[in-house]
């Protein structure tokens, strides 16, 4: 068992418009994210199942390389994304959200998540 205080974790500045903190065990990871208005998470997919919950702002998701249809998540909304499903996202306003992944995102742990570091 490990006790962690989020307030004592340093935020990683992944790029000029994205900060995150995350913790993980062997089978699950949770990340607290902050994005500036207009940031786009480009098309990507990963083996990990993902649950996203929005606390502030609007997070717009597109799925399956379909740029015409989208889903907006507002504060209090959550979405479950199955593993290997292509998606991208746009931040409308300042966005504060959490992402939970199972299994943990190894590319985030080892810093090889280059698609976010541009």
What would you call each of these model-derived segments?
Residues 1-27, 94, 114-118:
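A short, N-terminal "cap"/entry segment at the start of jelly-roll beta-barrel domains
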Residues 29-46:
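Conserved short histidine dyad/triad with adjacent acidic residue
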Residues 40-41, 60, 79-88:
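Histidine-centered metal-chelating micro-motifs
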Residues 48-60, 64:
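Glycine- and acidic-residue-biased ligand/ion/polar-headgroup-sensing regions
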Residues 55-56, 74, 93:
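A cytosolic small-molecule/anion-sensing beta-strand core signal
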Residues 67-83:
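Short acidic-glycine-tyrosine-enriched beta hairpin
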Residues 83-107:
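Ligand-binding loop in jelly-roll beta-barrel domains
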């Amino acid at each position: 068992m490990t006790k962690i205080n989020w307030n004592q974790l340093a935020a990683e500045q992944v790029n000029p418009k994205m900060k995150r903190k995350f913790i993980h065990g062997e089978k699950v990871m949770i990340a607290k994210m902050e994005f500036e208005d207009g940031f786009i998470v480009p098309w990507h997919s990963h083996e990990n199942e993902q649950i996203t919950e929005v606390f502030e702002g609007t997070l717009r998701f597109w799925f399956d390389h379909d740029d015409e249809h989208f889903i907006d998540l507002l504060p209090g909304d959550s979405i479950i994304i199955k593993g290997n499903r292509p998606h991208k996202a746009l931040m409308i306003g300042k966005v504060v959200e959490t992402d939970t992944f199972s299994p943990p995102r190894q590319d985030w742990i080892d810093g090889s998540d280059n698609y976010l570091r541009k």
